[in-house]
Design a protein with these regions (language model features):
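Compact, glycine-rich, soluble single-domain proteins
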Residues: 1-52
Length: 52
């Protein structure tokens, strides 16, 4: 597993099969940390604990 350190507002770019997926570290209105994910609609995004 690759582990990266990011600050709020910074992102990483994943390139998979020619598709660009951007994952950013953001905060919500309560100050909690969250992941923001920008990906083409053809990319399925789900939480790991949910079935495919």
């Amino acid at each position: 597993m690759l582990v990266l350190t990011r600050s709020v507002g910074q992102a990483v770019i994943l390139s998979v099969a020619g598709l660009k997926i951007r994952v950013a570290l953001i905060t919500d209105s309560s100050g909690a940390l969250a992941l923001g994910i920008d990906a083409p609609r053809s990319v399925s995004i789900r939480r790991e604990e949910l079935p495919p």
